[in-house]
């Protein structure tokens, strides 16, 4: 679904937690929790030293992943641009053999992390609707 109001809310809430000042800490906490809960996925990040989330290689990669999501969230209300961005990310993830279920795990953890950050200001339903819309456009 991800209607106009939900898109606005998601953009605003995402900007609150993923602003320039908070991006590194947000990324570190997110990936620490995500890989702790899914240790078998660490092997997906061997190329970027995923065994050490504090390494510069992994921190840069973690921020790149979230920055990719940031770029999509930023154009949620610009459908032609959004369509191109989703197609680009889908091609990248298809080429890398990313399994569709990884997007579901990622989204679940991201929602939990956003809820921790935003507390009672988090609109979980809006996030889920828009994340599901985004993920459906990227999943291989």
Swiss-Prot record:
Source taxonomy lineage? Answer: Eukaryota, Metazoa, Spiralia, Lophotrochozoa, Annelida
Annotated Globin domain residues: 1-140
Q: Does the keyword Isomerase apply?
A: no
The protein in question is named Extracellular globin-1
Which GO molecular function, any one, fits this protein according to its record? iron ion binding
Q: Which domain of life is it from?
A: Eukaryota
Its assembly, as annotated, is: The giant hemoglobins of worms are formed of a monomeric subunit and a disulfide-bonded trimer. This subunit is monomeric.
Q: What keywords are assigned to this protein?
A: Disulfide bond, Heme, Iron, Metal-binding, Oxygen transport, Secreted, Transport
Say which family it is in: Belongs to the globin family.
Q: Which InterPro entries match?
A: Globin (IPR000971), Globin-like_sf (IPR009050), Globin/Proto (IPR012292), Haemoglobin_extracell (IPR014610), Mb-like_M (IPR044399)
Q: Does the keyword Transport apply?
A: yes
Q: Which residues bind heme b?
A: 93
Spell out the coiled coil positions from the record: none
